[in-house]
Amino acid sequence: MNYMRIIFKKFKARMIVGCILAVIALLAVSVIVFINQASFGRTPRGERLERVMKSPNYRNGEFKNQHETLLMTSDRGRFSGIWEFIFRKIDGLRPEQAVKAIKTDLRKIGRNEEILVWFGHSSYLIQTGGKRILVDPVFCMASPVSFVNKPFKGTELYTPDDMPDIDYLVISHDHWDHLDYNTVKKLKDRIGAVICPLGVGEHFEYWGFDKERLIELDWNEDCLLYTSPSPRDLSTS
């Protein structure tokens, strides 16, 4: 009887270990599948990677700020800071009522009008000199998962379908709340050119944008936007 108990305990222990390993393996596979979605884009390669590595701002495998920047200003460690940022409750963080906003039919605005429409955060539409410039549009998701970074009620007025044809799409950087995969995919065929930081063009090429439509700029580089009556300079800093 004791012998059978020992065998059963060993079998039970192996079953528990096996179940734990199976759960870990399943989680690992799930994470790998999740981060390999098209929406995560692709890291630079080929000629683009060579240009990135030749940048004076790229050192030790990453871009470096030109000036020293403090990431943590408190005495707390990084983990405790992240924990507090995620789980700390702040009163009044979200409006109790829907934000009042007026939706404009952007497609009916003539190209000769000078306008600026702010959609929230860093997303806005500029129309100047007969050209339309769309900056950091986020009309679908501002994070990899739908339950994080949800828009305030009343601010989700616009969709990609509401946008007019765009001459220049400007992306400041590739954080989720500035580069929305679903938005740019839906606008792809109505965008003339994409202006983005060095290396970020890899995402767009991976998503089906022609390489000829991509203008990638390093810090302190600039390009001319052909607007009427005269060209305008767009510089990075």
Tell me what each language-model feature is.
Residues 126, 220-225:
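Short acidic-hydrophobic surface loop/beta-edge motif
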Residues 147-195:
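Active-site metal-binding motif and surrounding structural segment of the metallo-beta-lactamase
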Residues 204-218:
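Helix-loop-beta element that forms the nucleotide-linked donor phosphate-binding surface
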Residues 226-233:
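Conserved small/polar residues in nucleotide/adenosyl-binding loops
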